[in-house]
From Swiss-Prot:
Its EC number is 2.7.4.25. One of its GO terms (cellular component) is cytoplasm. It catalyses: CMP + ATP = CDP + ADP; dCMP + ATP = dCDP + ADP. Belongs to the cytidylate kinase family. Type 1 subfamily. Its main location: cytoplasm. Coiled coil: none annotated. It is an enzyme of class 2 (transferase). NCBIfam families: cmk. One of its GO terms (biological process) is pyrimidine nucleotide metabolic process. Pfam families: Cytidylate_kin. GO terms for molecular function: ATP binding; CMP kinase activity; dCMP kinase activity. It comes from Azorhizobium caulinodans (strain ATCC 43989 / DSM 5975 / JCM 20966 / LMG 6465 / NBRC 14845 / NCIMB 13405 / ORS 571). This is Cytidylate kinase. The keyword RNA-binding does not apply.
Length: 206
């Protein structure tokens, strides 16, 4: 069973993916971390504008060394959005994601193009979204715990910018797969969102 969860930045898809995977005993891959890791590598090398360097970083990425906490900063999130728009980076990471999904028992993957590009034959496809304001508030609370200088206005502006870039990039733009189920979490808490998502998964399992 492959469960594909897509959606824009800070929509809650990663939290849902982790919860669903844990509940069903499946492996989970937050594919956004892959792009964050590539973005972080480029930032560290001072080569965010170097497309060849970003493609090489994607090709040599070791998923076993990913550190979610260190990768969840505003600067790395912005860098991830930049490198994710590059076809060469996406191509380098597609095979890695598909190998992960090909586990005999199945897997849960969340990202921007799982249901539309990576796993078009997924058993279940969810498209998780929320209003930009709600997503900005969620991301702001995450960042404020680590960065006292974080501001809601800056986070909201970043959300709008990332939405624009994700939706209009040439390589695998953010789109809802035609056979995906829409889940709007604007007015749902974590537990309510999980219950709604799990109900969709259970229906698909029959």
């Amino acid at each position: 069973m492959i469960i594909a969860i897509d959606g824009p930045a800070a929509s809650g898809k990663g939290t849902l993916g982790k919860r669903i995977a844990g509940h069903l005993g499946l492996a989970h891959l937050d594919t956004g971390l892959l792009y964050r890791a590539v973005g972080a590598a480029c930032l560290a090398a001072g080569k965010l504008d170097d497309e060849a360097a970003s493609v090489e970083a994607a090709r040599t990425l070791d998923v076993t060394t990913l550190d979610p906490e260190s990768l969840r900063t505003g600067a790395i999130g912005e860098a991830a959005s930049v490198v994710a728009a590059r076809p060469g980076v996406r191509a380098a990471l597609v095979d890695l994601q598909r190998r992960f999904a090909a586990r005999p028992e199945g897997a849960v993957l969340d990202g921007r193009d799982i249901g539309s590009v990576i796993c078009p034959d997924a058993t279940v496809k969810l498209f998780v979204t929320a209003s930009p304001e709600v997503r900005a508030e969620r991301r702001f609370k995450e960042l404020a715990a680590r960065d006292p200088l974080a501001s809601y206005e800056a986070v909201l502006a970043d959300i709008h910018k990332r939405d624009e870039r994700d939706s209009n990039r040439a390589a695998a733009p953010l789109v809802m797969a035609s056979d995906a189920v829409l889940l709007d979490t604007s007015h749902l808490g974590i537990e309510e969102s999980f219950a709604a998502a799990l109900a969709i998964v259970e229906r698909a399992r029959g």
